[in-house]
Amino acid sequence: MADLNKLAEDIVGLTLLEAQELKTILKDKYGIEPAAGGAVMVAGPAAAAAPAEEEKTEFDVVLTDAGANKINVIKEVRAITGLGLKEAKDLVEAGGKVKEAASKADAEAMKKKLEEAGAKVELK
């Protein structure tokens, strides 16, 4: 039982990037697809935020595609996030949030830099 507790602690302690890598490993090696519950959890806060109808002031910068020139995109991700080379490379290859809760001006500046480097980026 102690081994299961240790495993649970390790899983809970994963960073977002590590969790993304774990998901990829489970899917590719073992054929385990993510549960539908994840999509429900993501949709919940968005539905709650909709009635407010206030102008959004914080944005998440999400990398959807690294494009053909990954090296320049990795450099920009490192500059924006302060991540190490391996972590930035993993983030670029996996896609996902580059920065969370950035101001509108900062998020647009990050999006512009990443797009100039060849990436496809969304602001959410």
From Swiss-Prot:
Gene3D superfamilies cross-referenced by the UniProt entry: 3.30.1390.10, Single helix bin
Pfam families noted in UniProt: Ribosomal_L12, Ribosomal_L12_N
Gene Ontology cellular component terms for the protein in this record: cytosolic large ribosomal subunit
Alphabetized UniProt keyword annotations: Ribonucleoprotein, Ribosomal protein
GO biological process, alphabetically ordered: translation
UniProt KW Cytoplasm keyword: no
UniProt xrefs under InterPro entries: Ribosomal_bL12, Ribosomal_bL12_C, Ribosomal_bL12_C/ClpS-like, Ribosomal_bL12_oligo, Ribosomal_bL12_oligo_N_sf
MF annotations from Gene Ontology: mRNA binding; structural constituent of ribosome
Subunit structure: Homodimer. Part of the ribosomal stalk of the 50S ribosomal subunit. Forms a multimeric L10(L12)X complex, where L10 forms an elongated spine to which 2 to 4 L12 dimers bind in a sequential fashion. Binds GTP-bound translation factors.
UniProt family annotation: Belongs to the bacterial ribosomal protein bL12 family.
Reported function: Forms part of the ribosomal stalk which helps the ribosome interact with GTP-bound translation factors. Is thus essential for accurate translation.
HAMAP family: Ribosomal_bL12
Protein name per its UniProtKB record: Large ribosomal subunit protein bL12
Organism: Cereibacter sphaeroides (strain ATCC 17025 / ATH 2.4.3)
Lineage summary: Bacteria, Pseudomonadati, Pseudomonadota, Alphaproteobacteria, Rhodobacterales
